[in-house]
Regions:
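Phosphate-binding and adjacent anionic-ligand microenvironments
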Residues: 277, 281-283, 304, 324, ...
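Conserved phosphate/anionic-ligand binding catalytic regions in large, soluble enzymes, centered on
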Residues: 31-51, 136, 221-229, 233, ...
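N-terminal small/polar loop signature for handling phosphorylated ligands or for N-terminal nucleophile
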Residues: 79-142, 239-296
Length: 545
């Protein structure tokens, strides 16, 4: 890669400022690596070189995508949404120009939008594809591109691999010439307001009404896209008992008022807690910057805050959906393979079928696509705070979940109960399955090697017992094999390949997987055992020592 040529083109790259703030190692990585279009699209840091996001690598991606779309169908169409991050607007315009150059009709909004509305818009406008420009909850110097198929789900693995090949065939991004003509820009159309209206109507119909109680809510968008749509939605449902964390409900690509724009991180709630204490609020809700994930916390009468993890929120929402859909037959819940044993136990107890899929909401969307006319999907979720109640969206959707959780909490409040009370009742009914996640960040090329080494070592040395827990089976989703230790047999897993190892016990499971979007390796634990916290810490220390 011609580093000198890249530096000469820095002024045109849109990212010169970011490049100049990077360390020597970070700068070098941009020239020594390449962005790859994977199953979750592309996500990375800004900077120079083919390993970073900049004007030229975005043009390369857009050109490859244009060729892919034109090869798939005649007269393709696409809708593009973008969040509040640095360069999201600029990247959206670049991609729109490239696609328009290839006679692809592009629907482009004049302001930021949420990820779930993009999924809805693809279906509503009946476009060939969709693009979401976001890096979700990553730090401020990241952005990314997610591509959606015509059913509103993220691209399948096979389609992603094909798009990746088209992108690679483009070659050197510095050699791309994108002429702009008035004739071509006529292919770029304004995004219809009717789509947003229809999206809100679907949620309004799903919720019905929120019962009158004295529930008080604090809401924060963490500087992201869920404002103004969430406040407008709540008001349309005649729910006005909420306060916004005003400082965090303004779009800010630097996420200035939060240490972490991630609802999984309790620090994201710091200002919400302050406001809740002042306003004596009961329920605190935060959404991540692109509004596909949400976190909740609850404040009791003494000012004590209870934070709920993604699995606990999933259990609460599943419990509520089971109550709401008692008249339906053939009910189905879908969750990822690293999500809790608690929700599976709750589904079994209530005669609700459940399915497990690989991590990534597109695999949940694939299951939804394959439902027959008799099946009723009542809930889907991932432990990473992604939830879906009704499938008019084919990705996780915090916007539809906010009023749902408020309605649930309002009903409980009428009976003098809380979400914490309800969770305790679930534990008493199906058992106290507890969950935790250890996430280890290992950045750069060295970090990537370390992650690979950990996975290889774990595969080469499969355990028979861990901290007194007897291993029943080991599932390796990379080889699509499950080894039953008690029977000494190996069988196939009917699932796409993925770099995940899951160890099963009578008490639950642990799972190990590298993140697909961040330089992290994650250890998941879902167990019903005494001294859970101590056992979890010891297993984490054993694997990562």
């Amino acid at each position: 890669m011609d580093k000198e040529l890249w530096i000469k083109r820095a002024n045109d790259s849109l990212v010169k400022h970011f490049y100049e703030q990077q360390s020597d190692i970070e700068q070098r990585e941009g020239f020594e690596s390449k962005l790859t279009f994977g199953t979750a699209g592309i996500r990375g840091k800004f900077g120079l070189g083919e390993g970073r996001l900049n004007k030229f690598t975005i043009e390369k991606l857009a050109l490859g995508l244009a060729r892919y779309l034109n090869a798939q169908t005649n007269n393709p169409t696409i809708v593009i949404h973008y969040d509040i991050r640095h360069l999201s607007t600029e990247f959206a315009q670049i991609i729109a120009n490239v696609l328009a150059n290839h006679q692809i009709i592009v629907y482009l909004p004049d302001t930021y939008k949420t990820t779930p509305e993009l999924s809805f818009a693809v279906r509503n406008l009946n476009t060939t594809a969709g693009i979401m420009i976001t890096a979700s909850h990553n730090p401020k110097d990241y952005n990314g591109i997610k591509v959606y198929s015509s059913d509103g789900a993220q691209l399948s693995t096979d389609a992603s691999e094909l798009v990746s090949r088209y992108i690679e065939e483009v070659g050197d991004p510095l050699q791309i010439d994108i002429p702009i003509s008035k004739q071509n820009t006529s292919y770029i159309k304004p995004f219809p307001k009717s789509v947003t209206d229809d999206y809100m109507k679907h949620i309004q119909n799903m919720i019905g009404y929120i019962p009158k109680s004295d529930l008080q809510v604090v809401f924060t968008s963490l500087h992201g896209t869920s404002v103004p749509i969430v406040p407008e939605l709540l008001k349309s449902l005649n729910f006005n008992q909420f306060n916004l964390v005003e400082a965090q409900c303004k779009p800010d690509p630097n996420f200035s008022s939060v240490q972490s724009a991630n609802p999984e991180d309790h620090r994201a709630f710091d200002q919400a807690v302050e406001l809740a204490n002042k306003s004596h609020a009961d329920l605190l809700i935060s959404t991540d910057p692109d509004a596909d994930r949400l976190g909740i916390a609850e404040r009791d009468a003494h000012g004590h805050i209870t934070y709920f993890n993604g699995n606990q929120i999933g259990a609460l929402l599943l419990n509520y959906r089971i109550q709401q859909t008692s008249q339906l037959r053939h009910r189905l819940m879908i969750q990822s393979i690293v999500s809790s044993e608690l929700t599976k136990s709750l589904a079994r107890y209530n005669n609700v079928e459940y399915k497990e899929v690989l991590t990534g909401f597109k695999f949940i969307a694939q299951e939804i696509r394959q439902l027959d006319d008799h099946q009723n999907m009542i809930f889907a979720f991932e432990e990473s705070y992604g939830f879906l109640s009704e499938p008019f969206v084919r990705d996780k959707d915090a916007v539809q979940i906010v009023p749902l959780i408020i309605k649930y909490a309002s009903e409980l409040k009428l009976y003098g109960k809380t979400l914490k009370d309800e969770l305790e009742q679930i534990y008493q009914t199906v058992g106290r399955h507890e969950d935790t996640l250890f996430s280890h960040t290992l950045e750069g090329l060295e970090g990537k090697k370390k992650i690979e080494s950990i996975m290889t070592h774990f595969r080469s040395n499969p355990p028979q017992e861990i901290q007194g827990l007897k291993v029943k089976a080991i599932e390796d989703y990379l080889t699509s094999e499950v080894y039953q230790l008690d029977k000494d047999t190996t069988s196939q897993i009917d699932s796409p390949k993925s770099n995940v190892i899951r160890v099963l016990f009578d008490e639950g499971f642990i799972a190990l997987r590298p993140s697909g979007t961040e330089p992290k390796i994650k250890l998941y634990l879902s167990l019903k055992c005494p001294d859970f916290d101590d056992v979890a810490q010891k297993i984490n220390a054993m694997i990562f020592s």
